[in-house]
């Protein structure tokens, strides 16, 4: 049986950009509790975005997140011994969480450049509607579309 619902923790906005989304990105980048290192990576990547695009990095980042956020995903559902991939709508907080996760994962997967450059390039690519994170979103949507026949199994 399920226990009670997990409480949603309040997250403090980022000290430099006063934005909760940036704070979430910093937390996603952070490894082993090294927040200062994560902040340095994020801020340097924002400077890089400013340099390359000439636009406000915060706006670019927010638009990139908006572009990567998925609408649908598939969830496994067991029905009489068979497991079906059932397409379901993604809830609001999870949309943002997945978008951040995919952007960071895509940046980490690239090699040969400093992390701040990889992150900035992935954010810029997502802003333009290209890149690995956008590919991931499209794959998830394709999977949901392919399993549309099982939509009636939603719970």
UniProtKB/Swiss-Prot annotation:
**What domain of life does the UniProt record list for this protein's source?**
Bacteria
* Keyword Ribonucleoprotein among UniProt keywords: yes
Where are the disulfide bridges? none
Matching InterPro entries: Ribosomal_uS7, Ribosomal_uS7_bac/org-type, Ribosomal_uS7_CS, Ribosomal_uS7_dom, Ribosomal_uS7_dom_sf
Q: Name one Pfam family in it.
A: Ribosomal_S7
Is Transcription there in the keyword field? Answer: no
Gene Ontology CC: small ribosomal subunit
A GO BP entry is:
translation
* An example molecular function term from Gene Ontology annotations: rRNA binding
Outline the subunit composition: Part of the 30S ribosomal subunit. Contacts proteins S9 and S11.
As for what it does, the entry says: One of the primary rRNA binding proteins, it binds directly to 16S rRNA where it nucleates assembly of the head domain of the 30S subunit. Is located at the subunit interface close to the decoding center, probably blocks exit of the E-site tRNA.
Its recorded name reads Small ribosomal subunit protein uS7
Record organism = Pseudothermotoga lettingae (strain ATCC BAA-301 / DSM 14385 / NBRC 107922 / TMO) (Thermotoga lettingae)
Annotated gene: rpsG
């Amino acid at each position: 049986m399920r226990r009670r619902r997990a409480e949603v923790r309040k997250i403090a906005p980022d000290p430099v950009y006063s934005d909760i989304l940036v704070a979430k990105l910093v937390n996603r980048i952070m490894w082993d509790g090294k927040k200062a290192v994560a902040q340095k990576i994020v801020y340097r990547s924002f400077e890089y975005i400013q340099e390359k695009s000439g636009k406000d990095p915060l706006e670019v980042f927010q638009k990139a997140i908006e572009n990567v956020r998925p609408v649908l995903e598939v969830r496994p559902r067991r029905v009489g011994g068979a497991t079906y991939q059932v397409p379901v709508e993604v809830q609001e907080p999870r949309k943002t969480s997945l978008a951040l996760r995919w952007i960071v994962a895509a940046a980490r997967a690239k090699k040969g450049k400093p992390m701040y450059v990889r992150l900035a390039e992935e954010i810029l690519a997502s802003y333009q509607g290209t890149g690995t994170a956008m590919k991931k979103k499209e794959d998830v949507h394709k999977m949901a579309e392919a399993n549309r026949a099982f939509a009636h199994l939603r719970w």
